[in-house]
Amino acid sequence: MTTMDHRFPSRIFVNERTSITREQLNSLLETYNVFYENQKNLHILYGQTEDGQLIVEGMLDIFWGVKRPIQLKIQDEKQISSFDLLKSPETFSSKGRMTRWGEFDDLYRISEMDKTQALAPEARHTPEDYLSCYSVLKQCADEEPESPLLYRTVSEAALVRKRMRAPEMYRKDRMGTLAKHRASINGHVYDHETSIFTPTFGSETKVRANSIMKTEEVIKQLLQKFKIENSPRDFALYIIFGTGEKRKLKKTDVPLLQRLIQGPSKSNARIFLMDKDAEEISSDVAPYINFHFSFLKSILQRLDEEEKMEIERIMAKFNTERAFILKCLQSKRAAKTETTV
């Protein structure tokens, strides 16, 4: 990795209070990229904008940790990259091997299995095929509409509801319509009929971020990637450390630089997308969160006992000192009275 040009600023700000030197950034980048030596697409590299501003760019791992349901958009929208504000595509040199925005977006795709089923020969379909459906997270792509009520025969008075095979053109049109309404998160496909869901806690995704993007911009980028309607203000980014500590990123934080500072190992720290009101966990409390409730209760009981003992010790010392002071005052008063007489 080449050393940064001397024209770049001497310090790079992680937030309004924290900054790192160019040398520190060089070291962090080198450590990070060596860790992913065999995965060039995960490297974090730097370049400069049209106005000469230093910019660091790469893939950012984000883990799902939301509890509230999220709503997928019904219609896809053209994604607007934050890099449109930069000098593109000349922002980074070819030597930097910077990847394009659309790459590694394999989490957003249409189920090939559904397409194969929809285009399969008619002879392979059985009545059970049209009665089957997938789980809540994956709806059947070629689910056929029901026909009107039909009489079975003239002699039979009972009415039955019959499944009928729709025309081939109709099925293809329906498949195309469903394809427009789908997004996929970690391999699970959703359509407009099951577009409200909660992602599995701890499932991983990636977004392309840079050192110009603050916390809210990264959240917007993630929601845009999966076509999620919820407002970015409903969510926040948290760093969860291996110790159990959980810290909320500020609006002024640069998540990509925070990832660099924590190092490449996910066992040390992970960035989660969570509800904005998720509770933080301090470093003092973190060591106790994995203990059993009965054990924690015994610790509290022991602390209460120690507190009572300490209070009793302090009160005893206070009473002793108070008695000594009163005794001294009384002796001085007695001596003064004798002198006066």
UniProtKB/Swiss-Prot annotation:
Domain SARAH: 285-332
Domain Ras-associating as annotated: residue spans: 190-278
Biological process terms in GO annotation: apoptotic process; positive regulation of apoptotic process; regulation of apoptotic process; signal transduction
Keywords assigned: Apoptosis, Phosphoprotein
UniProt keyword Phosphoprotein, yes or no: yes
Cross-referenced InterPro entries: RA_dom, RASSF1-6, SARAH_dom, SARAH_RASSF6, Ubiquitin-like_domsf
CDD domains: SARAH_RASSF6
Modified sites of kind Phosphoserine: S155
Pfam families: Nore1-SARAH (PF16517), RA (PF00788)
Database matches in SUPFAM superfamilies: Ubiquitin-like
Domain of life: Eukaryota
Function: Involved in the induction of apoptosis. May act as a Ras effector protein. May suppress the serum-induced basal levels of NF-kappa-B.
Subunit and partners: Interacts with MOAP1. Interaction with activated KRAS is still a matter of debate.
PANTHER family tied to this protein: RAS ASSOCIATION DOMAIN-CONTAINING PROTEIN 6 (PTHR22738:SF3), RASSF (PTHR22738)
Protein name per Swiss-Prot or TrEMBL: Ras association domain-containing protein 6
Taxonomic source organism: Rattus norvegicus
Lineage: Eukaryota, Metazoa, Chordata, Craniata, Vertebrata
